Amino acid sequence: MLKKAMVAAAAAASVIGMSAAAAPQALAIGDDNGPAVANGNGAESAFGNSATKGDMSPQLSLVEGTLNKPCLGVEDVNVAVINLVPIQDINVLADDLNQQCADNSTQAKRDGALSHVLEDLSVLSANGEGR
């Protein structure tokens, strides 16, 4: 009885292992074209559409609609520790993206810079991908 259970468990484990081995592997291959950008793809915005009703309920007339989406585009700034040692964030594993204050926009990153180090190895590269 125990032998039959062990045989069934081993067979199930081998089937699961074979299906996992046959599944496509997620490798960083091929996507060298840079970030893909789509701006305002079917998006709509409405500003200044607030209303207050009743006595003594004023609107913010000077800034009405401008506080809906405040946006301050600030570049990366080097920060000095006690004004002695400048510290800078250098992206090694990822690419820089400088899309700030882009309303209704999407920027899809490409594969990271160091993800293509092993690209030319035949075991890890695009075997039969048809570049």
Swiss-Prot record:
Its GO biological process annotations read: cell adhesion
What phenotype has been reported when the gene encoding this protein is knocked out?
A single rdlA mutant does not form the rodlet layer on spore cell walls; disruption can be complemented by rdlA from S.tendae or S.griseus but not by any rdlB. Decreased levels of rdlB mRNA. A double rdlA-rdlB deletion shows no effect on spore germination, growth rates, differentiation of aerial hyphae into spores or surface hydrophobicity on a number of media, but spore surface rodlets are missing and cells adhere less strongly to a polysytrene surface. In the double rdlA-rdlB mutant chaplin proteins are still correctly localized to the cell wall of aerial hyphae.
Q: Which GO terms describe its cellular component?
A: extracellular region; spore wall
**Major location, coarse class?**
secreted
Location in the cell: Secreted, Cell wall; Spore wall
What UniProt keywords are attached to this protein's entry?
Answer: Cell adhesion, Cell wall, Secreted, Signal
Q: Which superkingdom?
A: Bacteria
Position of the signal peptide: 1-28
On induction, the UniProt comment says: During aerial hyphae formation. Expression is activated by ECF sigma factor BldN.
* UniProt domain comment: The N-terminus of RdlA is more highly charged than the same region in RdlB; replacing 3 charged residues by polar residues confers the ability to form amyloid rods to RdlA and allows the mutant protein to form rodlets by itself, which neither RdlA or RdlB can do alone.
Family membership:
Belongs to the rodlin family.
**UniProt function note:** Probably forms part of the rodlet layer on the spore surface; despite their high similarity both RdlA and RdlB are required for rodlet formation. Plays a role in cell adhesion to polystyrene plates. Does not form amyloid fibrils in vitro, unlike RdlB.
- The identity of this protein, by name, is Rodlin protein RdlA
